[in-house]
Amino acid sequence: AASDVYKRQTIQYGDADVMIAGGTESSITPIGIAGFSALTALSFSEDPERASIPFDKERNGFVMGEGSAIVVLEELEHAKRRGAKIYAELNGYGCSSDAYHITSPAEDGSGAATAMLNALKDGGVEPEELTYINAHGTSTHHNDLFETRAIKLAFGEHAYDLKINSTKSMVGHLLGAAGAVEFVTCVKEIQEGYIHRTVGLRETEEELDLNCLLYTSPSPRD
């Protein structure tokens, strides 16, 4: 995700017309597993269907995954001149740092809320115009709870009108490739008019009361 932001800035500042951005990760190794196990971040579920279950009340950690996604970012008029197929437009981005903890975000979600609001402001979009969020949704207790708080903090009552899902429910946590793969997922969802469900999500807890697209619910098309 950081790569996409940097490359967009490079084009926006006029330093380049076309940039390649993305991420890749191959971290399922003994040291990778040992490190995240030491952090008690990995799921200990023996049932594959109940392992990576973002926003579910029985979530107990994430499942490591591997993958890669690469995108071509291009200045709009330059792309039009060469007749490029345009899949989507990257309107804005937002960054923040709550300086709370090296691995855990601020419990009130303020840092993530600031990033979302900054992205909307940069893109010239009002919060009420947004209809969908592809959440970080790692399936850890703290992330999913604090991220839900962040969405509520950023969007207020409109948070309950949003459709929210987590791609990690299907592919696990791709670490350095997560942002890039989920970026491509969002583009394809826009292109196909289809929002995938949060696979494995069966029942949420009281505070996780947003529309995170239960696995048993129909996938919306809009």
What do these predicted regions represent?
Residues 19-24, 85-93, 128-135, 162-169, ...:
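Beta-strand segments within the central parallel beta-sheet cores of soluble alpha/beta enzyme folds
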Residues 1-4, 38-63, 149-180:
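Conserved catalytic cysteine-centered active-site region
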Residues 123-129, 160, 209-217, 221:
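Flexible, low-complexity linker/loop segments at domain and module junctions
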Residues 7, 36, 72, 90, ...:
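Conserved small-residue
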Residues 1-9, 215-222:
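Conserved small/polar residues in nucleotide/adenosyl-binding loops
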Residues 3-25, 63-84, 173-195:
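Active-site-proximal alpha-helical scaffold in enzymes
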Residues 47-123, 132, 198-201:
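Condensing-enzyme catalytic core mediating Claisen C-C bond formation in acyl metabolism
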Residues 100-109, 138-155, 174-181:
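Short glycine/threonine-rich loop-to-helix capping motif typified by GTGT followed
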